[in-house]
Regions:
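Bacterial signal peptide processing site
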Residues: 24-26
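Short, well-ordered beta-strand elements
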Residues: 34-44, 95-99, 122-125, 171-172
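Surface-exposed binding/hinge segments that line
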Residues: 121, 130-197
Length: 203
């Protein structure tokens, strides 16, 4: 697990020019009176920083260093929990219940605390992906119960989709069929949280 307890509020035209400039500035580490600074050159500039809808590797190389999902891969490629501190799977393998860490926060591009990260943010993220026809939708569209019907317009009520915020720190996801590798999909941006208030403020 990463030794951090915050999530930067990135994506959807969120990062400041200063942060982007630091990412595209040199390729070496340097020190200053303010401490250590690390600069890195990315091979390709991202078209945008929307980690929910973009399927581009350049976007996820950057936002993957700023946003946490329920799981991540360690340096050996092993799947480890990130924002999920515990989880259970029903006997039939269809329902996953995740208990979230209670110390994760959203921060804006100025470093100011914006809000707590809650289970609702994960629901909002998947709804946002469906409503905006994410390039990565194919990864989860046939997996989550009711999501394909919502995306196709057969059902217009997202509450019928199998992703629920049971409470602020409990998320439940119901699948169409058992997928032993399901948790590995939760390392991908399309399953990451997004703050509803922030999205609404951006129109």
């Amino acid at each position: 697990m990463k030794k951090r307890n915050v999530i930067a509020l990135a994506g959807v035209a969120l990062l400041s020019a200063g942060i982007l400039a630091a990412c595209s500035g040199g390729s070496k580490s340097s020190s200053s009176s303010n401490g250590q600074k690390f600069s890195y050159v990315y091979e390709t500039e991202p078209e945008n920083l929307n980690y929910i809808t973009s399927g581009k590797a350049a976007t996820h190389e950057i936002t993957g260093n700023l946003i946490d999902g329920l799981f991540e891969n360690d340096k050996y490629g092993n799947l480890i929990p990130s924002l999920a501190k515990d989880w259970t799977v029903s006997a039939d393998g269809l329902t996953y219940t995740y208990k979230l860490r209670d110390d994760a926060k959203w921060y804006d591009s100025e470093g100011e605390e914006y809000a707590d990260v809650t289970a609702k943010d994960f629901v909002t993220g998947i709804k946002y992906a469906a409503d905006n026809k994410s390039e990565m939708l194919y990864i989860i569209q046939d997996s989550i119960k009711g999501l394909n019907d919502y995306v196709s317009g057969k059902n217009k009520d997202f509450s019928a989709v199998g992703v629920k915020a049971v409470d602020d720190h409990t998320l439940q996801i119901t699948l169409n069929q058992a997928e032993p590798f399901w948790n590995s999909k939760l390392t991908l941006g399309i399953t990451f949280p997004i703050n509803e208030k922030f999205v609404e403020s951006k129109g």
